Amino acid sequence: MPDHLPRRQVLRTAGALGLGAAAAGALSSTAEAATRTTAGSGTPDKLHGMRAHHGKLEIRKNPFDTTPDGEAVDVYTFTNGRTTISMLTWGATIQRVETPDRRGHIENISLGFDNLPDYAKLSPYFGATIGRYGNRIAKGRFTLDGVTYQIPINNGENALHGGTIGFDKKVWKAKVVQDDRSVGVAFTYVSPDGEMGFPGELTSTVTYTLDRRDNLRIDYHATVAGKATIVNLTNHVYFNLLGEGNGTIYDHVLELNAPKYTPVDAGLIPTGEIAPVAGTPFDFSKPTAIGLRLRGDHEQLVFGRGYDHNFVIGGHADSNGLRLAGRFWEPEHGRTIEVLTDQPGVQFYSGNFLDGTFLGIGNKAYRQGDAFAFETQHFPDSPNHDNFPSTVLRPGETYKSTTIYSFGTK
């Protein structure tokens, strides 16, 4: 994916999207922005938009709620003076992401709840750390080392995001991590052998840190004892760059570094094909409004009620193994997100199954298209497809992965 596009091409794109002159200018400026990686840091040094004020890095811990079993759930809030992240020990969940727009107006741009019962009883996975296996496994079944394992079915006839009680519904242990460059929390959960049908005792630590340049870095680390297992950890944060509950994301502009994707069947299970995006509604190689082709009659869009597909990330990795997966921007207010990862795929979900029944923070109803998710990952149902990258983790091996959400404005 090119670091910038010719201005004439950007203006043609803006015209196709029905954007006005001001929005077209914002689109042009954002498209011309470049991103580089600071040597040895593994985090992007943004060359566009407002740069973060080097404010004081702060973190605080407060009680949030208590589970029915009497286990305390805490909320950690950490900030660099410009961007503020709130996370729960329940599900190692991102509850809030507060960022300014180009005028300095701060909004929460992530979906979430303000009470524990909604997180516990409902299943939208708002902001949750997902495991032991993110995304779908066909019929909840896979075979490893000659043994067939069954995961509880919770999504049609398939298993989704680790089964009926995944890592999103566990209380994680938390430890503050802070130095002179970043601040955040390391969350740890030990999943016993056989939990949700998965083999092996899996110890997972997921560390969320915010640096002075508005980069939210997620470092995943896992080891297994006793038996081999499968692992696919991710985070299911939902974003709306207008601010949560402030309208749809259909006018958000997306540029994806993904020349291919994995088509699915009617149950949203990959067919095994790795198909080119060229000539399809899945081609976001140039900046395109999310809603432009969303309601087309392409079979894949019909299956997902929109976008709910794994994209195969392209391009070359930097010295830290990271590749740019995609860029989002909202031209009216100017907020942007760039996502870097070392994972082979990313699930782009356009909020198709939000139906107004979820009342989020401030009692706002979340409706179809009110947010998007961008989940870095190995491919869905990988254990049942030999041509997909392996998700097997064996005793003595270490699972490591990094994803960075870089917030900005233009």
Question: What is each of the regions a protein language model found here?
Answer:
Residues 1-18:
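N-terminal secretory signal peptides and thylakoid transit peptides that target proteins
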